[in-house]
């Protein structure tokens, strides 16, 4: 119980346990899910509203600070603003009531000092007066002090940087009621050290008297300079230990920011998620600041600058990171289960967010409540010095941070998941297109792999927030969202100067917020300690009660007397150049009111332009707001075979295909065909046209396609049916193909849209193939069922027995030693010398770099690894080896080879080169070759397992030494005697072919993929077995992997499609699985062969009375194993 009251940062991992959620947790989680659900249903609305609210808040802050100084500059006119100089002053009382100790009092306005000696103590700082290149600061006697003012110099107080500063200082004390007159008199001090005789001389100008001479641009610069000067003064009068602590605090805060970005990068977001977390924190700060100041709690910049770094470091960004990890994990889990769930139970993006909130929401709220409670306790404490005020502000910041986490940030996560879905869709589609698949088929496959599933339509558009968009709109969407937010705020900031200062009264909610930027009260003892000591001695000796107002230091700068140019600046009109007009308008010197500013032609055009941009932006954002994610209401339907393409939901008009309907004439049918209305003809009419040669057999699918009449699946199925009839009735072959039309070859209920243009032509149906699973087999710590499509009995059972033995020894371990598909074109040259020159150039660094750049430019996935050349007469063979991502990659690499050869012929001086063939059998593809066995092709994998001796005897019914001897004599010596290349195994091809057929691989590549050497040895009484397969050619996208049944098997193995973060990992994992399955098959067959009773066991336990096929070593081996098992059980 006590552990639950500790925040997550302080709890150990062991303290978290899965228990039944209590009543409070269920209620809190339900509220959070409801809030986040409403926010995510309208993501654009949520983001825009919150961003505009935050913009309004900080515009109020700036309107009361930065631009107030800009407006006020027009009222200075070279005069001293005494009230401005007095801001930040502190009052100190000394007398009997304070036991003759300095006591800090409240502001001057709230005190009555009648009958008290009220003095003012001011310090003048002359910038750079001690530097060699500058004039000397004036002495105290050189100041133009009025005759009726009794200002007396007192010792000034040095600061931390005084020993190496170039500034000099003077301090004066005088009666407080003489301060305005005194400051106005000393706003300009002559420079007595100047040697200038002619013209205007420089003077020491008080900082407050410099504003109006520079127009609006100068006023803004003045504000920035004042802010920087205040910061420097604060540093100068701070203690060393305070500076060290604050420096460490700010360093820690920025390290927290860096840690946030690294954490989000590990979760898959390089920038945007971390940036939105920071935006959410800034919004929470603005809202908390608004509420705090509205409630009358005084907050200033000094308090914020000292407290915020430690608040950021203490609270951190753990909660957004935890929620992000939970949402992304839930999305990945839902996506993984999407292929196994029925259409009525498919999870959506919102379901992922709801699941994450259900798992982590209550714990996050609990942590917020604990932290807020601690801050409330700090705010209620009696500790002075700003702690109470900052704790009050921090509690509100955390409250709004919690609210924004489950509204603003969950909306951002919803958009992130949507963008991730679009990226997966586009990546898969482009990878399929690069592998040679048509755009339409690639789009269908990518749509069927989408999560959540979207309607597959024949277009190049994708869905975002329920609306179809082009793929190129994704990046534009992100840029417009961010750019739009920035633009709205730029317009807000830029229009502030055009608002009348009286407008502040119309925003009472923001009236107190501007006080945040008011000058921070100074520490009088750090600024004027020596002067106070002098006053103390005088007051104590006279026993006179004294109040001293310590005025913040006033800076002087040596420059020409700008106050004299103020009058000239006031006389400027709109007749001068437009640039000056605009700057004066921004500064507020010409604008008397908003109405007057609109009358100016330049300003009015600027306002109209800003208004136009705002309207365009709002139109885009609120049009995008209609893209809200809405969950479709899905009525429960009975279980039925799932079809990936959901186009059949559309209702189509019925067409009359009754064979008894009178047939149209041939001329009418041809007219329908020319009008591209052939789909309206009956089947018999279409068969007749095809037999007469009017419709080519390969064009039936294209002819049948009519989206207004039927779906593509139905049209293609009809095309297959018609083609079967055409083949059966073709006069030249009807004697032997006549039975095809009514044969048992199935053709219905198959998605031919994935076949057309990708896998097969002239389709007349599909062949069902028995599919079994072997295993489970543990591979690198993960258990798999191995899908195997075969017509050879007991092959799956044999592999399963090997898997059982391997699992008993701890599973198989695999190592990937190479990954690179190859293509070996043949090029010819007129002479041997030219061919040799080309070989030397390709083998050089220059040739390799040029060909690599050309090759890599053709694909986002293909990356050239190695070039190998061989010369045969005037023919040059070049073997390109490259990575191909998760595709098997033959088409992808062929495009790269063509591009590289073109660049070599046209740009590298080999224009006499002739490309004989893009494939010169130097690859080598679909043929047994020593080059594949030595250099590898595709994935090179080694799989190993250690089988305990007792498992060999009990499960495999064999002996370790017998297995080792059999492997040496059969697989090694026997294959060598036969002159085999890569055939040093028992039956690797059996398993490779079965897995290839089940997972949509190219069965013809079984030739080189089955190259394998099996090794065995006795390791301390245990059997160590390994298979080395240097050329496994597999892919998880493209080819037959796009078919529904085959992709389901890839899904079962967890390697379907392209890997989301590291392209190529899925294909490499499939190669590991194939090698481990071969290892299991090799172990089982060799064990059965080593048993020595194959013939007797096969004859005794053969279940087929009549011979239906020739027995194989596998069937005999597994039958022998069954016989031995049955015998032992008896």
Swiss-Prot record:
Residue ranges of the region described as Disordered: 1103-1130
Lumenal side: 68-242, 292-296, 388-389, 498-601
Binding site for NADP(+): 859-861, 886-894, 1102-1103
Reaction(s) catalysed by this chain's protein: (R)-mevalonate + 2 NADP(+) + CoA = (3S)-3-hydroxy-3-methylglutaryl-CoA + 2 NADPH + 2 H(+)
One Pfam family from the record: HPIH
Transmembrane segments: 47-67, 243-263, 271-291, 297-317, 367-387, 390-410, 477-497, 602-622
Residue positions the entry lists as glycosylated: 148
Domain SSD: 242-415
Effect seen on changing residue 412 to S: Contributes to acquired resistance to azoles
Pathway: Metabolic intermediate biosynthesis; (R)-mevalonate biosynthesis; (R)-mevalonate from acetyl-CoA: step 3/3
Binding-site list for CoA: 798-804, 955-957, 1097-1098
Topology of the protein relative to the lipid bilayer: Multi-pass membrane protein
Record field: compositional bias (Low complexity): 1103-1122
Sequence ranges on the Cytoplasmic membrane side: 1-46, 264-270, 318-366, 411-476, 623-1130
GO cellular component: endoplasmic reticulum membrane; peroxisomal membrane
UniProtKB keywords: Endoplasmic reticulum, Glycoprotein, Lipid biosynthesis, Lipid metabolism, Membrane, NADP, Oxidoreductase, Steroid biosynthesis, Steroid metabolism, Sterol biosynthesis, Sterol metabolism, Transmembrane, Transmembrane helix
Swiss-Prot/TrEMBL induction comment: Expression is induced during iron starvation.
Gene Ontology MF terms in the entry: hydroxymethylglutaryl-CoA reductase (NADPH) activity
Main location: endoplasmic reticulum
CDD domains assigned: HMG-CoA_reductase_classI (cd00643)
Catalytic residues (positions): 792, 926, 1002, 1098
Role of this protein: HMG-CoA reductase; part of the first module of ergosterol biosynthesis pathway that includes the early steps of the pathway, conserved across all eukaryotes, and which results in the formation of mevalonate from acetyl-coenzyme A (acetyl-CoA). Hmg1 and hmg2 catalyze the reduction of hydroxymethylglutaryl-CoA (HMG-CoA) to mevalonate. The first module starts with the action of the cytosolic acetyl-CoA acetyltransferase erg10B that catalyzes the formation of acetoacetyl-CoA. The hydroxymethylglutaryl-CoA synthases erg13A and erg13B then condense acetyl-CoA with acetoacetyl-CoA to form HMG-CoA.
PANTHER family for this protein: 3-HYDROXY-3-METHYLGLUTARYL-COENZYME A REDUCTASE
Protein name per the record: 3-hydroxy-3-methylglutaryl-coenzyme A reductase 1
């Amino acid at each position: 119980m006590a552990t639950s009251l500790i925040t997550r940062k302080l709890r150990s991992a062991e303290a978290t346990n899965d228990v039944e959620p209590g009543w409070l947790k269920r209620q809190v989680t339900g509220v959070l899910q409801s809030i986040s659900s409403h926010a995510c249903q309208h993501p654009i609305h949520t983001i825009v509203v919150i961003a505009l609210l935050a913009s309004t808040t900080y515009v109020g802050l700036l309107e009361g600070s930065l631009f107030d100084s800009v407006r006020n500059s027009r009222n200075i006119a070279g005069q001293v603003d005494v009230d401005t100089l007095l801001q930040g002053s502190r009052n100190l009382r000394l007398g009997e009531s304070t036991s003759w100790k300095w006591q800090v009092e409240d502001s001057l306005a709230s005190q009555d000092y009648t009958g008290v000696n009220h003095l003012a103590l001011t310090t003048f700082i002359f910038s750079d007066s001690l530097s060699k290149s500058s004039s000397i600061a004036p002495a105290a006697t050189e100041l133009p002090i009025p005759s009726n003012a009794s200002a007396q110099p007192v010792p000034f107080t040095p600061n931390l940087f005084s020993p190496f500063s170039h500034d000099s200082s003077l301090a004066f004390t005088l009666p407080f009621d003489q301060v305005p007159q005194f400051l106005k008199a000393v706003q300009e001090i002559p420079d007595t050290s100047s040697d200038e005789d002619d013209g205007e001389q420089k003077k020491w100008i008080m900082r407050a008297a410099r504003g109006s001479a520079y127009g609006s641009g100068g006023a803004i610069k003045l504000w920035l300079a004042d802010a920087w000067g205040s910061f420097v003064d604060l540093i100068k009068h701070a203690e060393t230990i305070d500076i060290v602590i604050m420096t460490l605090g700010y360093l820690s805060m920025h390290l927290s920011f860096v840690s946030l970005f690294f954490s989000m990068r590990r979760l898959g977001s390089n920038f945007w998620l971390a940036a939105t977390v920071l935006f959410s924190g800034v919004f929470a700060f603005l809202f908390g600041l608004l509420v705090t100041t509205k409630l009358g709690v005084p907050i200033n910049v000094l308090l914020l600058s000292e407290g915020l770094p430690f608040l950021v470091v203490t609270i951190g960004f753990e909660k957004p990171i935890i929620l992000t990890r939970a949402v992304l994990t839930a999305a990945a889990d839902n996506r993984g289960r999407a292929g196994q769930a029925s259409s009525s139970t498919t999870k959506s993006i919102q379901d992922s967010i709801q699941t994450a909130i259900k798992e982590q929401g209550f714990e996050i709220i609990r942590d917020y409540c604990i932290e807020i409670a601690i801050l409330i306790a700090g705010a209620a404490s009696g500790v002075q010095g700003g702690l109470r005020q900052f704790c009050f502000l921090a509690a509100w910041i955390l409250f709004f941070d919690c609210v924004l986490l489950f509204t603003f940030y969950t909306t951002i996560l919803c958009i992130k998941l949507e963008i991730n879905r679009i990226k997966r869709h586009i990546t898969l589609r482009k990878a399929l297109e690069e592998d040679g698949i048509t755009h339409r088929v690639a789009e269908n496959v990518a749509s069927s792999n989408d999560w959540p599933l979207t309607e597959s339509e024949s277009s190049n558009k994708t869905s975002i927030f329920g609306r179809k968009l082009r793929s190129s709109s994704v990046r534009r969407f992100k840029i417009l969202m961010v750019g739009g937010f920035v633009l709205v705020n730029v317009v807000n900031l830029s229009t502030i100067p055009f608002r009348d200062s009286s407008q502040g009264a119309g925003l009472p909610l923001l009236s107190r917020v501007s006080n945040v930027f008011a000058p921070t009260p100074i520490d009088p003892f750090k600024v004027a300690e020596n002067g106070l000591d002098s006053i103390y001695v005088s007051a104590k000796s006279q026993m006179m009660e004294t109040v001293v107002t310590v005025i913040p230091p006033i800076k002087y700068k040596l420059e020409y007397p700008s106050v004299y140019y103020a009058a000239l600046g006031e006389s400027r009109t709109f007749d001068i150049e437009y640039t000056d007009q605009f700057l004066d308008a921004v500064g507020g010197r010409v604008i008397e009111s908003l109405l007057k500013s609109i009358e100016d032609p330049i300003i009015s055009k600027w306002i109209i332009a800003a208004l136009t941009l705002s309207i365009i932006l709002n139109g885009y954002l609120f049009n995008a707001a209609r893209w809200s994610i809405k969950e479709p209401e899905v009525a429960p339907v009975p279980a039925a075979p799932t079809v990936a393409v959901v186009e059949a939901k559309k209702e189509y008009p019925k067409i009359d295909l009754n064979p008894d309907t009178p047939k149209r004439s041939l001329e009418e049918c041809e007219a329908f065909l020319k009008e591209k209305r052939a789909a309206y003809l009956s089947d018999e009419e279409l068969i007749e046209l095809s037999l007469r040669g009017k419709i080519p057999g390969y064009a039936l699918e294209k002819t049948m396609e009519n989206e207004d009449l039927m779906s593509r699946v139905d049209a293609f199925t009809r095309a297959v049916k018609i083609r079967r009839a055409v083949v059966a009735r073709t006069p030249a072959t009807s004697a032997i193909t006549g039975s095809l039309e009514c044969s048992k070859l199935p053709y219905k209920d198959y998605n031919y849209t994935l076949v057309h243009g990708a896998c097969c032509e002239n389709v007349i149906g599909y062949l069902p193939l028995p599919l079994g699973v072997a295993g489970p087999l543990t591979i690198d710590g993960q258990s798999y069922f191995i899908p195997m499509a075969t017509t050879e009995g007991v092959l799956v059972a044999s592999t399963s027995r090997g898997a059982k033995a391997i699992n008993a020894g701890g599973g198989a371990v695999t190592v990937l030693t190479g990954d690179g598909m190859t293509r070996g074109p043949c090029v010819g040259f007129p002479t041997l010398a030219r061919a040799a020159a080309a070989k030397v150039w390709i083998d050089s660094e220059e040739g390799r770099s040029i060909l690599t750049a050309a090759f890599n430019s053709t694909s986002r996935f293909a990356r050239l690894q190695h070039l190998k050349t061989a010369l045969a007469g005037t023919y040059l063979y070049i073997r390109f080896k490259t990575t191909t991502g998760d595709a098997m990659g033959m088409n992808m690499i062929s495009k790269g080879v063509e591009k590289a050869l073109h660049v070599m012929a046209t740009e590298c001086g080999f224009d006499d080169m002739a490309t004989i063939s893009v494939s010169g059998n130097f690859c080598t593809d679909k043929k047994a070759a020593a080059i594949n066995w030595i250099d590898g092709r595709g994935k090179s994998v080694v799989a190993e397992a250690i089988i305990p001796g007792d498992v060999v005897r009990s499960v495999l019914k064999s002996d370790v030494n017998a297995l080792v001897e059999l492997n040496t004599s059969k697989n090694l010596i026997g294959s060598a005697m036969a002159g085999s290349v890569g055939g040093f195994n028992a039956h690797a091809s059996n398993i490779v072919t079965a897995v290839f057929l089940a997972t949509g691989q190219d069965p013809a590549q079984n030739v080189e993929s089955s190259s394998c050497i099996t090794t065995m040895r006795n390791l301390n009484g245990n059997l160590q077995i390994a298979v080395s397969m240097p050329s496994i050619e597999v892919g998880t996208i493209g080819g037959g992997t796009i078919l529904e049944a085959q992709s389901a098997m890839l899904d079962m193995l967890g390697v379907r499609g392209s890997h989301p973060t590291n392209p190529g990992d899925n294909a490499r994992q499939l190669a590991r699985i194939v090698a481990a399955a071969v290892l299991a098959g090799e172990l089982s067959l060799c064990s059965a062969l080593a048993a020595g009773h194959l013939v007797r066991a096969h004859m005794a336990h053969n279940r087929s009375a009549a011979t239906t096929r020739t027995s194989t070593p596998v069937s005999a081996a597994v039958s022998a194993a069954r016989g031995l098992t049955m015998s032992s059980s008896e």
